[in-house]
Every structure is written in C-alpha cells, then in structure tokens.
Amino acid sequence: MKRYLLPLLVFVVLAVFLAIGLKRDPHEVPSPLIGKPAPAFDLPQLAAPEQRLTTQDLRGQVWLLNVWASWCVACREEHPLLVEAAKTHHLKLYGLNYKDKRDDALAWLKNFGNPYVLAISDTEGLVGIDYGVYGVPETFVIDKQGVIRYKQIGPVTPEALRDTLLPLLAQLEQAP
C-alpha cells in the first residue's frame, strides 16, 4: 500500500498544477508594469517624422497604446475592430508602429484604415522593450496620471473590447 502512496501524491500535485494552468487566460500574462508609470517615450510621428509625440503630451487623458506592425498577421485580424471602435467609441487610441519600415506602415494604414489619433514609429523596438512587449499586437490602457492600468496581449477581440477595455476606460475617465 505504501509503495502506491508516493506516485499517487505526485500525480495529485501535478494534476493540481495542470488545473491551475488551464484556468489561466493566455492573453492575460501578468505584467510588472501594471500599476506603474508608463515608460517615457519621445518618438517621431509616422505620418510626419519631423514632429514628435511624448508621454508628457498625453498626460491628463486616458489613452490606449496599440503596438502593431505591417508585417504582423494578428494585427490584421484586430485592425477592423480598432477602426470601428475608434469611430463608434471615439477612443484616444495611439499606435506604436513596432520594428517596421515607415513606407510599409503608411501603406498599410492607407489600405486598411487608420484608427489612431496619432501613430508613432519605434523602428528599433526600444520603446517596445521598455513596455515589455512580447510580440505584436499588444494594447495598453494608460490613465490620466500616466500609469499603466491594463495590458492586452494579442489581438483585441470584440469580447475584450466590450467586457474589459470599454468598462475600464469609462471607469478611468470618471476618476479625478
């Protein structure tokens, strides 16, 4: 009887870890940046590279930062939803074009629509690294004080927009 106890105990422990892992949403990878100030950036605008956008320019408003690239297949999946959401919900959505060629990114926005208030260019990917980007697309919600409140990994889905992003944006807009 005792010889079966150890394998049974190991099996139960492994089953518990598996159950915990299966309950987690793969799009909700914990980020050490949640609740911390958004990393500062000063980047050229995609459409007008001689002009720049900084995090300081966005202080005092709730905004979304969508990290995307023209070479990103999943970005193409979420893009129509972002275009529609920007129109219907008047989102303050800023695009961080990640490790991309400017001409490719501009052509992509021309072909598929531009949901962004402004798109900025991170050709070297350094700002993406500061934000802890695993891959594109990723979307961040940043509050009026410049603090990251949420990170969406992967494409924004209609469910994520309806159930998470829009309620959080409304809540943050009401905050002082």
Question: What does each model-found stretch correspond to?
Answer:
Residues F41-L64:
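A short beta-strand-turn-helix
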Residues L64-N66, G95, V141:
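Hydrophobic beta-strand core positions in alpha/beta domains
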Residues S70-E77, E138:
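C-type cytochrome heme c attachment motif
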Residues R76-G113, T123-I129:
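Structural microenvironment flanking redox-active thiols in thiol-disulfide oxidoreductases
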Residues Y4, K110-P115, D122-E173:
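Thiol/disulfide oxidoreductase modules built on the thioredoxin-like
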Residues Q61-W63, V67-W71, G135:
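Short pre-active-site segment immediately N-terminal to redox-active cysteine/selenocysteine motifs
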Residues M1-P44, P176:
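N-terminal targeting signals for export/organelle localization
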Residues K23-D25, P44-E50, A119-D122:
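Short gly/ser/thr-rich secondary-structure transition/capping motifs
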